[in-house]
Amino acid sequence: MCGFSVFLNYEPYLRELFSAEKRGGDESRILKIDNLVFAFHRLSINGVDDGSQPFVKDGIVLVCNGEIYNYEHLYEKHDLPSSHTKSDCEVILALYRKYKSIDFINELDGVFAFALYDTHTKQLIYARDKYGVRPLYIGFDKSSSHMIVSSTLGAFPSSMKDISQMESSFVNLIDTVTCRSMANINWYRNNHPSLSVKDALIFSVKKRLMSERPIGCLLSGGLDSSLITSIVVREHLKNGGKASDIRTFSIGMKGATDLKYAKIAADFLGTTHTSWEYDIGTFIKNIPNVIRDIESYDITTVRASVGNWLVSRNIRETTDIKVVFNGDGADEVCSGYLYSKNAPSLEDLQKDQEHLLDNIQYFDVLRSDRSISSHGLEARTPFLDKDFVNAYTSVDISKRAPKCVPGASSEQEVDITKWYLRKQFEGYLPDEVLWRNKEAFSDGVSSCERPWHTILKDHYKKSYGKTEEEVYKEIFFSMYGDIPVIPFKWMPKWSDTDDPSARTLKCYT
């Protein structure tokens, strides 16, 4: 994982220059060119020997936080000159040098946020991947023509007020002389899916196995992380490895529902599994650290991030693993949230699925990326592969809607979300995991008797006389100022509840 900041017409302080360092700890570099300063902090994943950024060639400068999985194919397809480094990201520089345009972005298969400067045209170009897996913030000070593009909010001085997330799947061109936007374009072009849903997800995992560093999997025991782990194990076995080579990790409080199912999945798959159990106090006391690193005050995002943050910290401190697979994004792509059962119509379900994906950069994918990368690890998120998303969402919505669990009796809860996905992968997991009802990670880290959401609400009311949301905002504002980082409060739809926890829904069992 890497972090970068680009400063236009701004004399940066070292604190601001190096605030992105928490996203990458192998190397840091600063480059000043024309009226721009580039700061880059690198964690080597591919190209561990020589992948130093910023890349500079023929008056073109590039910084990129990302992984381009099809870089070898692009070098061959476009007859590009050989890479000067082993970094997959350098293909972006090579493509721009050849075509002097941004039309190539739709060909990039991966996750990325990058900034590219052309000294000949004086244009700064910055872009973000389809679903915003990699973070990118933009800040302007219009009165003085100052501008900052950065992986982290920590790069922005308190005097800069006009700060926002870069829209996912967009590319922007800035005239660095006038500090004006010349174009803001959605680069994504949808293609007809060439793979089945099953093959697309398997291929999504397979290409993300590209790494020169050890690989592990977050395994909560839910469908999503368990399915990704199963595919990782199967691909590793095909390559001559052993299931026990794959390390899996879970976390929770005493009695956490996830810990039980994570062990069932790990035993079935044969992975080397580690689980950590912490008391409530450990979860609560780390919330300020979590808010600092995820750069959000959204309630459900903070709740879910604590477990993610703790397990990532432990992986960093106790293993040599640098790349971590996760199951995030499946609920947005596959209408997996429990409230989906209450959708009034298939049309409403379809609109909600599109809405969730359009805004995932502010919520679930933010949680996963920030919690993991803040500990110097690389998050791999196969469910947000653009080809898999395209394949899955091309299936008729009637097939993707919640359906009856196979073999369920009339007395049982029969509707289950992600039914279509589960059917594609029968045999990949034990049935009690494959057909396990949705349990949000923010809920599964706790027991049913003492749910995480009630623990937090009671704690803040008793200790501070404030709501959970008020406390989170105060912590965030004290660190970053009053920046509107979320467009709305995440809440379940079609439900009679005032809390985002799925355990407050009538359909929760």
Model-derived segments and spans:
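A short alpha-helix-loop-beta-strand transition element characteristic
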Residues: 431-437
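Short, well-structured alpha-helical segments
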Residues: 17, 89-93, 389, 422, ...
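Cysteine-centered catalytic environments shared across enzyme families
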Residues: 1-296, 318, 322
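ATP-dependent adenylate-handling active sites, centered on carboxylate activation for C-N bond formation
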Residues: 8-11, 120-125, 133-136, 140-141, ...
